[in-house]
From Swiss-Prot:
Multifunctional protein that plays a role in silencing host antiviral defenses and promoting viral transcription. Does not seem to be essential for HBV infection. May be directly involved in development of cirrhosis and liver cancer (hepatocellular carcinoma). Most of cytosolic activities involve modulation of cytosolic calcium. The effect on apoptosis is controversial depending on the cell types in which the studies have been conducted. May induce apoptosis by localizing in mitochondria and causing loss of mitochondrial membrane potential. Its main location: host cell. This is Protein X. A fraction may be phosphorylated in insect cells and HepG2 cells, a human hepatoblastoma cell line. Phosphorylated in vitro by host protein kinase C or mitogen-activated protein kinase. N-acetylated in insect cells. One of its GO terms (biological process) is viral genome replication. The gene is X.
Amino acid sequence: MAARLCCQLDPTRDVLCLRPVGAESRGRPVSGPLGDLPSPSASPVPTIDRAHLSLRGLPVCAFSSAGPCALRFTSARRMETTVNTHMILPKVLHKRTLGLPAMSTIDLEAYFKDCLFKDWEELGEEIRLKVFVLGGCRHKLVCSPAPCNFFTSA
C-alpha cells in the first residue's frame, strides 16, 4: 500500500508541510512511542531518539534504527523517481537494514530536502505544491493532531 503525501511550502514559517492524502491517512489513532499512529496493525519497528530530527509525516520506519523500508519516493504527477537518482537510495536503505555503514539519518533527511527543493527551484513552480507517493512500505504514516506535519528547511 502506498502512502500519499501532500507537500507544500509555507513561506511565512519557512517550513515544508507534509500532509497525508486520501484513505491512507484515515484510521483509528493509537498511541505509540512515536506519538499517534493511524493503525495498530503496523508492525513494530526499532526506534531511535528522533528529537533532533526535523523530518515529519513519514512512515514509522523512517525513524527506525534499521532505516526506512520504503524504496520509492516519487512525484505522482510525473511518476518519476526523485530520490533514487544520484545516490541510489534503495542500496543505501538496504545497507542500513543490514546494519552496514551507509548514509546517516541526518544525511538522509538532508537528501530528501535537497531533492524536493531542487525540483521546485529548477522547474520554477510557483505554487510549490506536489503530491508524492511513498511506496513499498507496510508501515503507516505518523499522524499527529496538529494540522500539519513539518519538516523544516533550516
